[in-house]
Protein backbone atom coordinates (compact mmCIF):
# COMPACT_ATOMS: atom_id res chain seq x y z
CA UNK A 1 0.00 0.00 0.00
CA UNK A 2 1.22 3.49 -0.86
CA UNK A 3 0.22 6.33 1.48
CA UNK A 4 0.13 10.02 0.57
CA UNK A 5 0.95 12.14 3.63
CA UNK A 6 0.09 15.84 3.81
CA UNK A 7 -0.71 18.51 6.41
CA UNK A 8 -1.54 22.18 6.83
CA UNK A 9 1.31 23.20 9.16
CA UNK A 10 3.76 23.06 6.28
CA UNK A 11 6.42 20.74 4.95
CA UNK A 12 8.88 21.52 7.76
CA UNK A 13 6.49 20.74 10.62
CA UNK A 14 7.73 18.30 13.29
CA UNK A 15 4.26 16.74 13.26
CA UNK A 16 4.66 15.83 9.60
CA UNK A 17 8.10 14.35 10.24
CA UNK A 18 6.76 12.30 13.16
CA UNK A 19 3.88 10.95 11.08
CA UNK A 20 6.20 9.98 8.24
CA UNK A 21 8.60 8.24 10.63
CA UNK A 22 5.73 6.29 12.19
CA UNK A 23 4.34 5.06 8.87
CA UNK A 24 7.38 4.73 6.61
CA UNK A 25 8.59 1.48 8.16
CA UNK A 26 5.07 0.05 7.83
CA UNK A 27 4.48 0.79 4.17
CA UNK A 28 5.60 3.02 1.32
CA UNK A 29 4.91 6.70 1.99
CA UNK A 30 5.23 9.87 -0.08
CA UNK A 31 4.92 13.37 1.35
CA UNK A 32 3.39 16.33 -0.49
CA UNK A 33 2.84 19.29 1.81
CA UNK A 34 2.48 23.08 1.60
CA UNK A 35 5.69 25.10 1.47
CA UNK A 36 4.41 27.25 4.35
CA UNK A 37 1.84 27.16 7.13
CA UNK A 38 -1.65 26.92 5.63
CA UNK A 39 -3.65 26.49 8.83
CA UNK A 40 -7.27 27.48 8.30
CA UNK A 41 -7.14 26.92 4.54
CA UNK A 42 -10.11 24.53 4.71
CA UNK A 43 -10.85 22.89 1.33
CA UNK A 44 -9.61 25.76 -0.82
CA UNK A 45 -7.94 25.08 -4.15
CA UNK A 46 -5.44 27.44 -5.78
CA UNK A 47 -6.95 28.67 -9.05
CA UNK A 48 -5.18 32.00 -9.65
CA UNK A 49 -1.64 30.76 -10.35
CA UNK A 50 0.24 27.59 -11.32
CA UNK A 51 1.46 25.21 -8.65
CA UNK A 52 5.16 24.34 -8.57
CA UNK A 53 6.25 21.17 -6.74
CA UNK A 54 9.79 21.06 -5.41
CA UNK A 55 11.50 17.91 -4.11
CA UNK A 56 13.51 18.62 -0.97
CA UNK A 57 16.71 16.94 0.21
CA UNK A 58 14.76 14.58 2.49
CA UNK A 59 12.55 13.43 -0.41
CA UNK A 60 9.47 15.36 0.72
CA UNK A 61 7.67 17.33 -1.98
CA UNK A 62 6.96 20.98 -1.16
CA UNK A 63 4.11 22.73 -2.98
CA UNK A 64 3.20 26.42 -3.18
CA UNK A 65 -0.44 25.65 -2.50
CA UNK A 66 -2.99 24.48 0.03
CA UNK A 67 -3.35 21.08 1.69
CA UNK A 68 -6.20 20.28 -0.69
CA UNK A 69 -3.97 21.21 -3.64
CA UNK A 70 -1.35 18.78 -2.34
CA UNK A 71 -3.75 15.85 -2.18
CA UNK A 72 -5.46 16.77 -5.44
CA UNK A 73 -2.16 16.80 -7.34
CA UNK A 74 -0.86 13.75 -5.51
CA UNK A 75 -3.79 11.66 -6.70
CA UNK A 76 -4.21 13.35 -10.10
CA UNK A 77 -0.91 12.72 -11.82
CA UNK A 78 1.94 14.37 -9.91
CA UNK A 79 3.15 10.96 -8.74
CA UNK A 80 4.13 8.12 -11.05
CA UNK A 81 1.95 5.76 -9.02
CA UNK A 82 -1.23 6.92 -7.37
CA UNK A 83 -1.47 6.55 -3.58
CA UNK A 84 -4.03 4.18 -2.12
CA UNK A 85 -4.60 6.09 1.13
CA UNK A 86 -4.34 9.68 2.37
CA UNK A 87 -3.14 10.50 5.89
CA UNK A 88 -3.09 14.13 7.03
CA UNK A 89 -1.21 15.51 10.04
CA UNK A 90 0.02 15.34 12.61
CA UNK A 91 -1.43 18.79 13.22
CA UNK A 92 0.12 20.75 16.09
CA UNK A 93 -3.13 21.86 17.68
CA UNK A 94 -6.59 20.37 18.08
CA UNK A 95 -9.21 20.03 15.37
CA UNK A 96 -12.29 19.55 17.53
CA UNK A 97 -15.93 20.45 17.02
CA UNK A 98 -16.48 23.31 14.58
CA UNK A 99 -12.72 23.52 13.96
CA UNK A 100 -13.19 20.92 11.23
CA UNK A 101 -14.94 23.50 9.04
CA UNK A 102 -11.76 25.56 8.79
CA UNK A 103 -9.03 22.96 9.20
CA UNK A 104 -6.66 22.35 6.32
CA UNK A 105 -5.62 19.13 8.04
CA UNK A 106 -9.16 17.78 7.92
CA UNK A 107 -9.68 19.19 4.42
CA UNK A 108 -6.72 17.23 3.05
CA UNK A 109 -8.32 14.02 4.33
CA UNK A 110 -11.71 15.02 2.92
CA UNK A 111 -10.13 15.61 -0.49
CA UNK A 112 -8.58 12.16 -0.33
CA UNK A 113 -11.96 10.62 0.44
CA UNK A 114 -13.64 12.68 -2.27
CA UNK A 115 -11.11 11.14 -4.66
CA UNK A 116 -12.04 7.66 -3.39
CA UNK A 117 -9.16 6.97 -1.03
CA UNK A 118 -9.54 5.92 2.61
CA UNK A 119 -8.37 8.92 4.63
CA UNK A 120 -7.42 9.99 8.15
CA UNK A 121 -6.81 13.36 9.80
CA UNK A 122 -4.61 13.33 12.93
CA UNK A 123 -4.28 16.26 15.33
CA UNK A 124 -2.32 16.65 18.56
CA UNK A 125 -3.55 18.85 21.38
CA UNK A 126 -0.44 20.99 21.71
CA UNK A 127 1.57 23.49 19.69
CA UNK A 128 4.70 21.97 21.23
CA UNK A 129 6.07 18.57 20.15
CA UNK A 130 6.77 17.24 23.65
CA UNK A 131 4.46 14.20 23.54
CA UNK A 132 4.27 13.90 19.78
CA UNK A 133 5.37 10.27 19.99
CA UNK A 134 1.97 9.50 21.53
CA UNK A 135 0.17 10.90 18.51
CA UNK A 136 2.49 9.05 16.13
CA UNK A 137 1.78 5.80 17.99
CA UNK A 138 -1.98 6.13 17.52
CA UNK A 139 -1.61 7.20 13.90
CA UNK A 140 0.31 4.02 13.16
CA UNK A 141 -2.16 1.90 15.14
CA UNK A 142 -5.23 3.21 13.32
CA UNK A 143 -3.71 3.18 9.84
CA UNK A 144 -2.65 -0.44 10.29
CA UNK A 145 -6.17 -1.34 11.45
CA UNK A 146 -8.06 0.54 8.72
CA UNK A 147 -9.22 -2.54 6.81
CA UNK A 148 -11.09 -3.75 9.90
CA UNK A 149 -13.30 -0.66 10.14
CA UNK A 150 -15.71 -1.35 7.24
CA UNK A 151 -16.60 2.34 6.98
CA UNK A 152 -19.11 3.78 4.50
CA UNK A 153 -17.29 4.87 1.32
CA UNK A 154 -17.56 8.65 1.88
CA UNK A 155 -16.35 8.70 5.49
CA UNK A 156 -13.19 10.26 6.96
CA UNK A 157 -11.86 9.61 10.45
CA UNK A 158 -10.91 12.74 12.39
CA UNK A 159 -8.59 11.77 15.25
CA UNK A 160 -7.47 14.02 18.13
CA UNK A 161 -4.78 12.87 20.56
CA UNK A 162 -4.25 14.44 24.01
CA UNK A 163 -0.91 15.96 24.96
CA UNK A 164 0.03 13.14 27.33
CA UNK A 165 2.71 10.48 27.60
CA UNK A 166 1.56 7.24 26.00
CA UNK A 167 1.19 5.46 29.35
CA UNK A 168 -1.23 8.15 30.57
CA UNK A 169 -3.69 7.78 27.66
CA UNK A 170 -6.85 6.15 29.04
CA UNK A 171 -8.00 4.61 25.76
CA UNK A 172 -9.90 5.50 22.60
CA UNK A 173 -13.45 6.88 22.42
CA UNK A 174 -15.79 7.15 19.46
CA UNK A 175 -17.23 10.66 19.59
CA UNK A 176 -19.44 13.20 17.89
CA UNK A 177 -18.35 16.74 17.12
CA UNK A 178 -18.89 19.20 19.94
CA UNK A 179 -19.60 22.87 19.27
CA UNK A 180 -18.04 26.21 20.08
CA UNK A 181 -19.70 29.50 20.93
CA UNK A 182 -19.39 32.42 18.55
CA UNK A 183 -15.77 33.43 17.93
CA UNK A 184 -14.35 36.62 19.37
CA UNK A 185 -14.45 39.72 17.16
CA UNK A 186 -11.45 40.37 14.90
CA UNK A 187 -8.75 42.52 16.47
CA UNK A 188 -8.19 45.86 14.75
CA UNK A 189 -4.64 47.15 14.39
CA UNK A 190 -3.23 50.29 12.77
CA UNK A 191 0.10 50.20 10.94
CA UNK A 192 2.72 53.02 11.06
CA UNK A 193 1.11 54.63 7.99
CA UNK A 194 -2.26 54.81 9.65
CA UNK A 195 -3.86 51.99 7.70
CA UNK A 196 -6.32 49.77 9.53
CA UNK A 197 -5.87 46.01 9.53
CA UNK A 198 -7.53 43.10 11.26
CA UNK A 199 -6.34 39.89 12.91
CA UNK A 200 -8.79 37.00 13.05
CA UNK A 201 -9.32 36.34 16.76
CA UNK A 202 -9.30 33.07 18.66
CA UNK A 203 -12.00 30.44 18.22
CA UNK A 204 -15.00 30.63 20.51
CA UNK A 205 -15.16 28.88 23.86
CA UNK A 206 -16.57 25.37 24.05
CA UNK A 207 -20.37 25.57 24.22
CA UNK A 208 -21.26 21.91 23.69
CA UNK A 209 -18.55 19.75 25.23
CA UNK A 210 -20.46 17.21 27.27
CA UNK A 211 -20.08 13.44 27.44
CA UNK A 212 -19.95 11.87 24.01
CA UNK A 213 -18.25 14.82 22.33
CA UNK A 214 -14.70 15.03 21.05
CA UNK A 215 -14.00 17.89 23.47
CA UNK A 216 -15.01 15.78 26.46
CA UNK A 217 -13.01 12.73 25.39
CA UNK A 218 -9.67 14.50 25.06
CA UNK A 219 -10.10 16.42 28.31
CA UNK A 220 -10.65 13.08 30.04
CA UNK A 221 -7.43 11.70 28.57
CA UNK A 222 -8.88 9.66 25.69
CA UNK A 223 -8.02 9.66 22.02
CA UNK A 224 -11.09 10.92 20.16
CA UNK A 225 -12.20 9.38 16.85
CA UNK A 226 -15.01 11.15 15.00
CA UNK A 227 -16.31 9.82 11.66
CA UNK A 228 -16.99 12.70 9.25
CA UNK A 229 -19.02 12.46 6.06
CA UNK A 230 -18.63 14.30 2.77
CA UNK A 231 -22.38 14.69 2.29
CA UNK A 232 -23.47 17.76 4.28
CA UNK A 233 -27.15 17.45 3.40
CA UNK A 234 -29.29 18.08 6.48
CA UNK A 235 -32.07 15.53 6.08
CA UNK A 236 -34.10 16.84 9.05
CA UNK A 237 -34.51 20.15 7.25
CA UNK A 238 -36.57 18.59 4.47
CA UNK A 239 -39.89 18.37 6.31
CA UNK A 240 -40.16 22.03 7.32
CA UNK A 241 -39.08 23.21 3.87
CA UNK A 242 -41.50 20.81 2.19
CA UNK A 243 -44.35 22.24 4.25
CA UNK A 244 -43.48 25.72 3.00
CA UNK A 245 -43.14 24.53 -0.60
CA UNK A 246 -46.43 22.61 -0.71
CA UNK A 247 -48.51 25.65 -1.58
CA UNK A 248 -46.03 26.95 -4.13
CA UNK A 249 -45.84 24.06 -6.56
Swiss-Prot record:
It is found in: Cytoplasm. It catalyses: a ribonucleoside 5'-phosphate + H2O = a ribonucleoside + phosphate. A divalent metal cation binds at residues 8-9, 39, 91. InterPro entries: SurE, SurE-like_Pase/nucleotidase, SurE-like_sf. Its cofactor is a divalent metal cation. It is an enzyme of class 3 (hydrolase). GO terms for molecular function: 3'-nucleotidase activity; 5'-nucleotidase activity; exopolyphosphatase activity; metal ion binding; nucleotide binding. Keywords: Cytoplasm, Hydrolase, Metal-binding, Nucleotide-binding. Gene3D superfamilies: Survival protein SurE-like phosphatase/nucleotidase. HAMAP family: SurE (MF_00060). NCBIfam families: PRK00346.1-3 (NF001489), PRK00346.1-4 (NF001490), surE (TIGR00087). Belongs to the SurE nucleotidase family. This is 5'-nucleotidase SurE.
